[in-house]
Every structure is written in structure tokens, then in C-alpha cells.
Amino acid sequence: MTVESVNPETRAPAAPGAPELREPPVAGGGVPLLGHGWRLARDPLAFMSQLRDHGDVVRIKLGPKTVYAVTNPELTGALALNPDYHIAGPLWESLEGLLGKEGVATANGPLHRRQRRTIQPAFRLDAIPAYGPIMEEEAHALTERWQPGKTVDATSESFRVAVRVAARCLLRGQYMDERAERLCVALATVFRGMYRRMVVPLGPLYRLPLPANRRFNDALADLHLLVDEIIAERRASGQKPDDLLTALLEAKDDNGDPIGEQEIHDQVVAILTPGSETIASTIMWLLQALADHPEHADRIRDEVEAVTGGRPVAFEDVRKLRHTGNVIVEAMRLRPAVWVLTRRAVAESELGGYRIPAGADIIYSPYAIQRDPKSYDDNLEFDPDRWLPERAANVPKYAMKPFSAGKRKCPSDHFSMAQLTLITAALATKYRFEQVAGSNDAVRVGITLRPHDLLVRPVAR
């Protein structure tokens, strides 16, 4: 199967007598009104993982809407690379209240291409070393703030460091702890509410003055107020540092006019919130991995000491820390922050021999794809060595794409891996970790995956 085989514009006409495209099978277990939404809400990870038993493409019902679920990694790669599938669908509709319609995360077509041109220079591989000193400082500040033997709330600490790195590197802002805490609290509420709105799309109910709806609306309003404060402070300062916020404030549209205020706002939201949320979630799962797999924490410590000779780990060491990187990738495989993605078919097309009608919403789960036993031996085992070159070559191409692929690939992939590597190396070098009584590392499903309430104790090495 090739990418071209799912592109209706490049697909060769069917030969006379060729079989007609099939309709995908329908998953069982739907109920009136809610369809499969109740199963997706009750146990979403199990539901999405079980769909692979029904075929490569499966029809499900979310409320009254038919949605096409894709379970085959090669077909998810085709979705990512094919321009006939746009960013749209239940996930993105649920995120519009946060991300807006004019940011790079939700835009399509010419607008998306122009926005990528604006932000991409900040994330080029040759631009990342300029952020190195900030990443180093934040990684080591994190280890200094924690005290041996004292319980650490992994949720708040992970989110705080993720927001600080993003703000200091990309916005050059001094909006640190107080705003990071506001962002952390508000995002937890907003992402939970948006997930409910995605899987059970009962719009009128979410407008009722119920306590959960009020909490959601208050948190969303505070997020947007926070972004407006950041933009206003930069303008009032008269400063123009070489950062992403300056690039946005000076960006032009296709007519050569300054971009609108709403687009600037939506772009800053896209910089601060989804990126910080996904990085923070990954740090939480890395802390769990360091606590639950001390042998790999020890290997990271040994690797760092071999590379640095005992000095503090630095940005210049990142590319040499191979096992550290493999631990990060394996943590992302088993617990991807972004566990579900959606697309919309612009035109009628063929996917894996099935007909996808124009306008159809398509959903797939990186969580399910990355745990598929057809792609991975010992698929549920935490095994960073599966990413050694000789073993990684056996993993299907699109069975592990934590930053997506094609034109919708996350632009900050190198930036994200650099900060995750520095933070993991700094933590594992200074401490061993153990979960404490009361810690709950069960998966909490929202727009992203987090532990419910991960509490760890650092133990000095």
C-alpha cells in the first residue's frame, strides 16, 4: 500500500470489473442517542485499542454522527501526508474554544502555510542551540528546588517547568511562577471539559448554568485573559527581542498588512498551551518511568557521567545521550500525551479499500497504534532498547510518530526533545525516584494523557 493509493486525485481509474469500494464495518456496542460515545467516555483507551480487531477502518457513532476510525499505522501515515484530509473533526471542534480558529494548530490551507512560515524559523534545528542556556538553567533549577525525601507533586512541577521553558525561550517573558500556576490550574479544567464535549457532543447541555460548566467557562476566560496580558505587556515595553512573539507582532498577511489581533492571540495560545500541556504530560510519565524502572534511571546516570565527566549536563551533551533519548521515546510510545487525533475528508476518497465520503470525520489513536502487537514485540513492556538502531528498523514506519508527520508535523519536535532530554538527564543524575503512599499513576484521560495524581520522592544519589 502506498500514499498514492489513498489519494483520490492521483488514484488511477478502477479497471473494468474491479470490485467497488467497501463500506467499513460498524463497531458493536452502540446505544441510542449516544452511539459509541458512552464507551469512548467510559474507557476510551480500551475502546480505541479494541477497534483494531474489527479491521483497518471501522465506523463508529459519536452521538448522531458517523465517524471513521483508522487502526492501521500505514493508513494513519497516509492521512497525515494526504492534503485531502484536513485538520477538523470532533477533537479540533472541541479545542476551538481554547485555540480559536486562526492559530496554526487549527488552520488549514493557505492560512496554515503562511503561519508555518512565520513560526518555523524559531524551531529550526540551527535555532535550538540559542535556547540551550535557558533549558539548562530550568532543568537544573528543577533539581535544586526539590529536596531529598520531600514529596513532589509531579503534575504541578512538570507543568511549571514546561511553561517556564516555553515562555522564556519563545516569548522571552518574565511571566513565570504565578502565571504558570494559573495556567496549570485552568488548563486541567479546560482540557477535561473539552474532552467531554468531544466524545459526547450534546451542545445545549454545555450551555446550562451547571457547576461543571461554570468552572469550565471561568477557566477558559482566565486562559484568554492571561494571553492578552502577555501581549499587552510586550507592546507596552516597546522591546523587540528576537523571539516568536516579536515575529508574530510584526507578521504580515498575504496582502502585506499586519495580521489581526485575533490571529496573534490564537498563535500565542497555541505556543503556550498545547505545547506546555504535552511536554508536561511527558515529564510526568518520565518521572513514573524513572521510579518504576530504576535500572534505566541508573543507566541514564551512568551515560550522563560518561559523557560529561562529572560536570552538570549541558545542551551540548544532548545528542550524545542515546539511552536517555530511548527512554524518552519509549515513555512516549506507551503513554503518548496526544492519544487521539481527528481529520476530515475534503472529498470522497479511498482508504484501505474502503470508501470515505466527502465531509466524513476520521479518528485515530496514537496510543492504540503504538501498542499494537502486530508492530511491537512485547508491546506492553517498557523496553527502551527497542529503539536501538538494529531493533528500531523492524518497527513499521508510521507505528511511532509522536510529533505526527507531513505538513501537520509538530514544528517544535527538536525543541521538545532537547528540553525533555536535559530535564530527564538532570533529574536521573541527581536523584533516584520512588512513588509514595497516596500516589495514583493510573491514566487520567482528557485531551491528553496524564497520571491521575503522581507523587514521587526524590532520593539523593
Swiss-Prot record:
* Deleted gene: phenotype: Disruption abolishes biosynthesis of both albaflavenone and the albaflavenols, but not epi-isozizaene.
Q: Which GO terms describe its molecular function?
A: heme binding; iron ion binding; monooxygenase activity; oxidoreductase activity, acting on paired donors, with incorporation or reduction of molecular oxygen; sesquiterpene synthase activity; terpene synthase activity
* EC assignment: 1.14.15.39, 4.2.3.47
Q: Provide the pH dependence.
A: Optimum pH is between 7 and 8.2 for monooxygenase activity and between 5.5 and 6.5 for farnesene synthase activity.
Set out the biological process GO terms recorded for this chain's protein.
Answer: antibiotic biosynthetic process; ketone biosynthetic process; sesquiterpene biosynthetic process
Assembly and partners are described as:
Homodimer.
Q: Which cofactor does it need?
A: Mg(2+); Ca(2+); Mn(2+); heme
Co-factor: note: Divalent metal cations. Mg(2+), Ca(2+) or Mn(2+) ions for farnesene synthase activity.
Entry function = Involved in the biosynthesis of the sesquiterpenoid antibiotic albaflavenone. Catalyzes the two-step allylic oxidation of epi-isozizaene to albaflavenone. First carries out a non-stereo-specific oxidation of epi-isozizaene to give a mixture of the albaflavenol epimers ((5R)-albaflavenol and (5S)-albaflavenol), each of which can serve as substrate for the second oxidation to yield albaflavenone. This is quite different from most other P450s which catalyze regio- and stereospecific oxidation. In addition, displays a farnesene synthase activity with farnesyl diphosphate (FPP) as substrate.
State the UniProt keywords alphabetically. Answer: Heme, Iron, Lyase, Magnesium, Metal-binding, Monooxygenase, Multifunctional enzyme, NADP, Oxidoreductase
What protein is this chain from? Bifunctional albaflavenone monooxygenase/terpene synthase
Q: Which InterPro entries match?
A: Cyt_P450, Cyt_P450_E_grp-I, Cyt_P450_sf, Cytochrome_P450_Monoox
Q: Which reaction does it catalyse?
A: (+)-epi-isozizaene + 4 reduced [2Fe-2S]-[ferredoxin] + 2 O2 + 4 H(+) = albaflavenone + 4 oxidized [2Fe-2S]-[ferredoxin] + 3 H2O; (2E,6E)-farnesyl diphosphate = (E)-beta-farnesene + diphosphate; (+)-epi-isozizaene + 2 reduced [2Fe-2S]-[ferredoxin] + O2 + 2 H(+) = (5R)-albaflavenol + 2 oxidized [2Fe-2S]-[ferredoxin] + H2O; (+)-epi-isozizaene + 2 reduced [2Fe-2S]-[ferredoxin] + O2 + 2 H(+) = (5S)-albaflavenol + 2 oxidized [2Fe-2S]-[ferredoxin] + H2O
What is the source species?
Answer: Streptomyces coelicolor (strain ATCC BAA-471 / A3(2) / M145)
- Entry's SUPFAM superfamilies? Cytochrome P450
Q: Which family does it belong to?
A: Belongs to the cytochrome P450 family.
